[in-house]
Amino acid sequence: MATTIARIGSANWAKLLVLLWLVQLATAGEPNPACKTLPTVDKDNEDKCCDVPEMFPNETLNACMEEHQQSSKPPLQKSCEITTCVLKKQSLIKSDNTVDKDKIKSYIKEMVKGSDEWKTLVEKAVLEECLPLMDKDPSNVLSKLKSSLGDCDPAPALTIACAAAKFYVNCPAKDRTKSPMCDEWRTFLSKCSNSLEDLNAIFMVLENQKTR
């Protein structure tokens, strides 16, 4: 799981699911019922649903993986720490562990390896859609999640998971794969990536599938 937390640059539909596993919330509000049933998952299909540009340098990803991957901590906590590590190494998190919105905006313009259309999409997803979700949090799910993550603040990792879903939903036509599976997932994520409760519902379904 942790290997793909920050590798949005080459993400396909399966990697998006891995990102959404970050959203393990102890308790939450009521999700959209439609988010409790996942679309078709073809594990043998490696087609990309969206060709997302590189977001973070490989050397940063590898350094954070080496630093945290071999830890004996629970997988969810390691994933949170790896994501936070990547953002810190890129100077995108303040000393109080909150995401630095001004630096995020500059980073997108200077470092994201994509077209202007992609940079606009990333900026909107992170700054206008996902970070505000963290601020709203009517069910206090972030504070409930912290109890299972040690000293790792879940908000940065949740922001990454949320943004990945938005990238898939709004993927530019030239970078989009047209297939029944991809179309089904885009429709699903357009409904189920707008609240922490909905993201949690996706996680719970995935966890149930893993234990079968």
Curated annotation (Swiss-Prot):
Disulfide bonds join C64-C85, C80-C152, C130-C162. The keyword Secreted applies. Coiled coil: none annotated. Its main location: secreted. Residues 1-28 form the signal peptide. It is found in: Secreted. SUPFAM superfamilies: Insect pheromone/odorant-binding proteins (SSF47565). GO terms for molecular function: odorant binding. GO terms for cellular component: extracellular region. One of its GO terms (biological process) is sensory perception of smell. InterPro entries: OBP47-like_dom, Odorant-binding_protein, PBP_GOBP_sf. Keywords: Disulfide bond, Olfaction, Secreted, Sensory transduction, Signal, Transport. Belongs to the PBP/GOBP family. Present in the aqueous fluid surrounding olfactory sensory dendrites and are thought to aid in the capture and transport of hydrophobic odorants into and through this fluid. This is General odorant-binding protein 68. The lineage of its organism: Eukaryota, Metazoa, Ecdysozoa, Arthropoda, Hexapoda.
